[in-house]
Design a protein with these regions (language model features):
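Glycan-recognition and catalytic cores of secretory/periplasmic carbohydrate-active enzymes
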Residues: 1-201
Length: 201
């Protein structure tokens, strides 16, 4: 399921590079996109009550799916993909967030309240990207809320995002910070992006 999202992103990047130079190959790629979408990203946790087919007990997995769906819309201009990402986020990602003295963050699973970087970093990025596409202060507030949770509970002073540091959690949080900077023009976000990416390098 989530591995499908990462593999599909590679195909999308290739599509973006060749779509104007090789229409035949671009058409083949677009067919792959449709097959992946129609097959619900090979969602092995799909239940009969899930009308979208993309819902999953693992919150981080749904965040990865949303990022790929958003990327598909950015690459093809087809709104069906980002509209599904919006649906998944609105109904089954942000609704899982819970609050304690450390702040409000996303749990790893529907039945596991632990809140980690591999869930909250891509979740923050999804919220920021949905805000840039649809507007809606709720998405911006969600992105800021998850950013605040990560900085307050997971980010180390040297730029590590939780232990052990993983390139995908470092990268998604760094990109979420960059997106928030471009939305708000507040330098705090760019400074955090620089800290996180410099540590990763």
């Amino acid at each position: 399921y989530w591995q499908q999202a990462h593999a599909m992103d590679v195909v999308i990047y290739s599509y973006e590079r060749i779509k104007d130079k090789n229409p035949a190959l671009a058409a083949t790629y677009k067919n792959y996109f449709k097959l992946w979408f129609d097959n619900k990203a090979n969602n092995y946790h799909h239940s009969d009550s899930d009308e979208t087919g993309f819902l999953n007990p693992f919150t981080d997995d749904m965040c990865w799916i949303c990022l790929t769906l958003i990327h598909l819309s950015e690459a093809t201009g087809d709104a069906v993909y980002i509209n599904m990402a919006k649906n998944i986020y609105d109904t089954h990602i942000i609704t899982r967030a819970w609050t304690d003295a450390k702040g409000t963050g996303l749990p790893w699973k529907s039945d596991d309240k632990s809140r980690n970087a591999c869930t909250n970093s891509p979740g923050c990025l999804v919220a920021a990207k949905l805000y840039r596409k649809f507007g809606g202060e709720n998405y911006l507030e969600d992105a800021k809320m998850l950013y605040k949770y990560i900085v307050g509970s997971l980010l180390k002073s040297d730029g590590r995002v939780e232990e052990p540091p993983l390139t995908y959690t470092q990268g998604t949080f760094g990109e979420a910070c960059r997106q928030l900077y471009h939305i708000t023009q507040e330098r705090e976000y760019m400074r955090k992006a620089e800290l996180v990416i410099n540590y990763t390098m």
